[in-house]
């Protein structure tokens, strides 16, 4: 009889996470969350685990973590003991310094590995970092960011200078930290840039395959139109003061009016852009975005690819 395990999917952002989460919702696995469909008006089926993985791991001070982690250990053991299948937790924000107020990887890794049983699996999904940052920028624009890509790139350069932002996506350093705290844990790495092996790795870990592993992202006719809309609706929203309120501060589904006010609903943008009947191409903007990214990002991306290729 195969022993049930906890599989923790913990990164990267903008790397087919939502596609995987939707497949997990449909599967027979004991999927705790994050559930993008927000079934029963909740992103997680367990409030204690939601609070720990969404808030305590990423943002809380040491006193809050020290009070909670043993309770979470017992809770995970309890759920796993009662489960007929593997237990899956998916939160792509656990790796990488997504926002300025995210704790460093070292602390987040220490926290989330400290509560996992011995036979647990860490699943990391990677992609080319230039594509990741471009997709992340478009995502921010879709929910209210009001500056062009050059301003955004300057902001992440500032974050890198003071917070080692780019290295928070360095797979070599991430694996080192995981092994430092929990050498017993199994680490599996998928890449959405390698379609051939992506589902093979999921399958060998008893996870559902993804029909399309392309990161869907939001397709606006032109991001300039979205920026103009943002500037008219919200004045001066920038990355360094950005708060993604619906993920950080609650496990409950927020009232639509509050989301509209604070997070800039995606579908609202889509409707507004459609009204403008503008047809443009992202290709030129994307090339300019890539050309202005620091070379360090490409170097880290190459390191990640080498590590992934060795595993495969």
Range-by-range predicted roles:
Residues 2-312:
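Anion-recognition interface
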């Amino acid at each position: 009889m195969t022993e049930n395990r906890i599989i923790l999917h913990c990164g990267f952002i903008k790397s087919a996470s939502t596609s995987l989460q939707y497949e997990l919702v449909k599967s027979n696995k004991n999927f705790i969350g994050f559930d993008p469909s927000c079934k029963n008006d909740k992103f997680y089926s367990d409030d204690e685990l939601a609070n720990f993985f969404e808030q305590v791991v990423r943002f809380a001070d040491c006193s809050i973590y020290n009070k909670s982690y043993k309770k979470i250990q017992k809770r995970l053991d309890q759920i796993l003991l009662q489960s007929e299948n593997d237990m899956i937790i998916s939160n792509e924000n656990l790796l990488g310094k997504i926002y300025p107020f995210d704790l460093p990887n070292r602390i987040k890794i220490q926290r989330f590995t400290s509560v996992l049983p011995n036979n647990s699996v860490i699943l990391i999904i990677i992609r080319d970092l230039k594509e990741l940052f471009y997709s992340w920028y478009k995502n921010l624009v879709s929910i209210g960011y009001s500056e062009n890509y050059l301003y955004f790139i300057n902001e992440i350069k500032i974050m890198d200078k003071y917070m080692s932002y780019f290295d928070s996506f360095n797979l070599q350093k991430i694996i080192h930290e995981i092994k430092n705290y929990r050498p017993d844990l199994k680490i599996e790495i998928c890449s959405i840039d390698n379609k051939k092996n992506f589902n093979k790795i999921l399958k060998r870990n008893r996870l559902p395959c993804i029909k399309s592993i392309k990161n869907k992202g939001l397709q606006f006719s032109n991001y300039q139109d979205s920026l103009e809309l943002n500037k008219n609706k919200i004045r001066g929203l920038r990355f360094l003061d950005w708060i993604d309120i619906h993920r950080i501060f609650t496990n409950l589904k927020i009232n639509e009016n509050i989301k509209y006010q604070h997070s800039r609903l995606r579908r609202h943008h889509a409707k507004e852009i459609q009204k403008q009947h503008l047809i443009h191409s992202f290709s030129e903007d994307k090339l300019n975005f890539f050309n202005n990214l620091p070379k360090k990002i490409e170097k880290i991306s190459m390191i990640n690819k080498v590590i992934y290729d060795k595993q495969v």
